[in-house]
């Protein structure tokens, strides 16, 4: 190659040319997966080294973006950086300008385990401290993003299950570095629980990646939840998602809708239960009335048997029977049938001819009077011998 065809640059020109090539040949934005090393803030800007173990590159978050980050990386964190290249022509240096930094799943899980272990050691995470939920809460405080599909589902479920409970909706941010904001809301609500008649708290968020749910692993937030004066129910993400907030709550539900189901009784089931109880009460009352009626009848019958009037009636009946018997045996009844009663002068009743002699005077008593007669002949019966 001839010398006149070889380009000649000054250092500044060369660096500028390199910068132009980078601008034309590289994406204006990209995702970079890396591990953070030696992060430090200088003059309000966050400087850090991004490495994958085999190579490294400098990175920076300008102060204007740093305040907007939802996550502040620490040394050793795995991250995904949304960035673009910055080339400084004066020194021919390349830096990744981070527009956003998100924790990698491994970082989220590592921080989760660290917080969980600390809170377990202190007894903050302890199933034994969980409080039971009110059966029919007067007021439920719903902390979630507004508007959101999660809130819409919760309100619909509340109306369907138990419309008598007042639902107090309190908007909160649910993603990013918002733990401090949620804590402030919780503290204000804790001070007004009595005034607002709040019986329970539902902390809810719809689905998202595990990284999106990282705010609910915040240690300070979870300590605040554990100290809340009313039972706390969480419905964060989906069934497979688990956060530290779920572990410190009094009840963990798989979804926001499931959280409402856990807090509120079912109106239809309650109605059926009430009807069943009413029927059982009617049956019991009816049985007791019938039992007491039978007892009353038995006692009434017993009293009848033991009453003076009943006794007098029994004596009267007995007297009547004896009177009838005496009447049946009375001589007058025999006289009425045509028979006669014979007696001697001494008034002694004569039962046979053996005590009568010829010439004796005999009185014959008949039904309508008496006859005095003298005995002329005595004729004993043939089967009796004469003395």
UniProtKB/Swiss-Prot annotation:
Its EC number is 3.1.11.6. It is found in: Cytoplasm. GO terms for biological process: DNA catabolic process. It comes from the Bacteria. One of its GO terms (molecular function) is exodeoxyribonuclease VII activity. It catalyses: Exonucleolytic cleavage in either 5'- to 3'- or 3'- to 5'-direction to yield nucleoside 5'-phosphates. Keywords: Cytoplasm, Exonuclease, Hydrolase, Nuclease. It holds the Pfam family tRNA_anti_2. GO terms for cellular component: cytoplasm; exodeoxyribonuclease VII complex. It is an enzyme of class 3 (hydrolase). Its main location: cytoplasm. Heterooligomer composed of large and small subunits. Bidirectionally degrades single-stranded DNA into large acid-insoluble oligonucleotides, which are then degraded further into small acid-soluble oligonucleotides. Belongs to the XseA family. NCBIfam families: xseA. This is Exodeoxyribonuclease 7 large subunit. It comes from Synechococcus sp. (strain CC9902). The gene is xseA.
């Amino acid at each position: 190659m001839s010398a006149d065809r070889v380009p000649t640059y000054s250092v500044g020109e060369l660096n500028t040319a390199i910068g132009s090539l980078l601008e034309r040949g590289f994406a204006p934005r990209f995702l970079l997966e890396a591990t953070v090393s030696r992060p430090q803030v200088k003059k309000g800007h966050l400087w850090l080294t991004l490495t994958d173990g085999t190579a490294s590159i400098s990175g920076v978050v300008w102060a204007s973006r740093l305040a907007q980050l939802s996550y502040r990386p620490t040394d050793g964190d795995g991250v995904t950086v949304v960035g673009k290249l910055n080339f400084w022509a004066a020194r021919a240096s390349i830096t990744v300008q981070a527009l956003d930094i998100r924790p990698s799943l491994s970082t989220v899980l590592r921080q989760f385990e660290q917080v969980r272990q600390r809170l377990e050691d202190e007894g903050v995470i302890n199933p034994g401290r969980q409080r039971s939920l009110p059966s029919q809460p007067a007021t439920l405080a719903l902390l979630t993003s507004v508007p959101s599909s999660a809130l819409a589902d919760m309100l619909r479920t509340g109306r369907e299950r138990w419309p008598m409970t007042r639902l107090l909706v309190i908007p909160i941010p649910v993603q990013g570095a918002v733990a401090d904001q949620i804590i402030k809301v919780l503290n204000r609500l804790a001070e007004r629980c009595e005034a607002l008649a709040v019986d329970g708290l539902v902390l809810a968020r719809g689905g998202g990646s595990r990284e999106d749910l990282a705010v609910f692993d915040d240690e300070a937030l979870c300590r605040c939840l554990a100290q809340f004066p009313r039972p706390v129910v969480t419905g964060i993400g989906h069934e497979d998602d688990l956060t530290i907030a779920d572990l410190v709550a009094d009840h963990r539900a798989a979804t926001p809708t499931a959280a409402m189901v856990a807090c509120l009784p079912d109106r239809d089931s309650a109605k059926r239960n009430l009807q069943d109880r009413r029927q059982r009460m009617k049956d019991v009352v009816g049985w007791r009335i019938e039992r007491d009626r039978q007892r009353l009848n038995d006692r009434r019958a017993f009293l009848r048997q033991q009453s003076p009037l009943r006794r007098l009636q029994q004596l009267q009946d007995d007297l009547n029977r004896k009177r009838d018997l005496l009447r049946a045996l009375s001589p007058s009844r025999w006289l009425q049938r045509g028979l006669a009663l014979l007696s001697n002068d001494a008034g002694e009743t004569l039962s046979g001819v053996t005590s009568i002699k010829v010439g004796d005077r005999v009185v014959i008593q008949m039904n309508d009077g008496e006859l005095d007669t003298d005995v002329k002949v005595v004729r004993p019966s043939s089967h009796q011998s004469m003395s």
